[in-house]
Amino acid sequence: MGLKKVCLTVLCLIVFCFGIFYTFDRVNQGERNAVSLLKDKLFNEEGKPVNLIFCYTILQMKVAERIMAQHPGERFYVVLMSENRNEKYDYYFNQIKDKAERAYFFYLPYGLNKSFNFIPTMAELKVKSMLLPKVKRIYLASLEKVSIAAFLSTYPDAEIKTFDDGTNNLIRESSYLGGEFAVNGAIKRNFARMMVGDWSIAKTRNASDEHYTIFKGLKNIMDDGRRKMTYLPLFDASELKAGDETGGTVRILLGSPDKEMKEISEKAAKNFNIQYVAPHPRQTYGLSGVTALNSPYVIEDYILREIKKNPHTRYEIYTFFSGAALTMKDFPNVHVYALKPASLPEDYWLKPVYALFRQADIPILTFDDKN
């Protein structure tokens, strides 16, 4: 056993004995245990290389699952990092966990950038990156996350593949077109630099040799001629046929994680006679006057199941800015509408999103949000 392996063993034993990396994390139920990684590093380092897939959202887990299906027989380690944990996150994490060789859920309820969370978590990620066997490919969607760079910088020779993260990949104002990671505070910035070296958003973007997109026919910010673009259909409605829509109409509002949207969402629901709201996976508040669809499924999977059960029902989906409008617009018996409050100024921050909806032929309905 070489000196490097001895040092890694000692460091891991210190971590396990004193619980340094678990001080602020008591709800992960062993999903961050590194014993298996240490065992591989010490005794099976020459085995078949692994592919890493990093996810931050349920949509990203759905894409990751499809990517894994295209590479049967290969080893995949999945890393989910999230500030949220609920029924939906657990359902889709367990789905992908069953298909991966290993899966890790980093639940960060206070966010990575909190001072007490940043340094121990980044240190944990760096240690675990060094415990991995040989890495062949790294897949990611959230280019702006410094946490992923802890792994990218450890394996600079690994192939980098990127994939879509909703509408972030379709608007020119996307954070994925940035240069450096946004880390607040000099101490945290200096520590991040120790963990990731000169890695940056731009370096990650430029290193990507292939990008998977779930949006067909829409201009992607990663489609700049530097890499292969691969279309990856995410939700399969090909076996469903449009019915005659004589079974009534179900109107559903897509929720938002932003609490500031509560009042305006309630007004929209009343204005358009919307009966249901599909809460966003990160939404923590309810809406009065509408019924919440409490389901472990994301809205696309939920609607596909409903169409199978009720092929003659008309489904109307209303949204302010959800990318699910784009993934559902071609479902049979589904009609998608974007909502625009009349009070929004001409230079409002959602303007690029509404331009995208127009490009996708999604009707935009303006309503009076002041009465």
Curated annotation (Swiss-Prot):
Membrane topology: Peripheral membrane protein
Keyword match Lipid metabolism: no
EC numbers on record: 2.4.3.6
Keywords: Cell outer membrane, Glycosyltransferase, Lipopolysaccharide biosynthesis, Membrane, Transferase, Virulence
Subcellular compartments: Cell outer membrane
Disulfide pattern: none
Protein name: N-acetyllactosaminide alpha-2,3-sialyltransferase
Source organism (scientific name): Neisseria gonorrhoeae
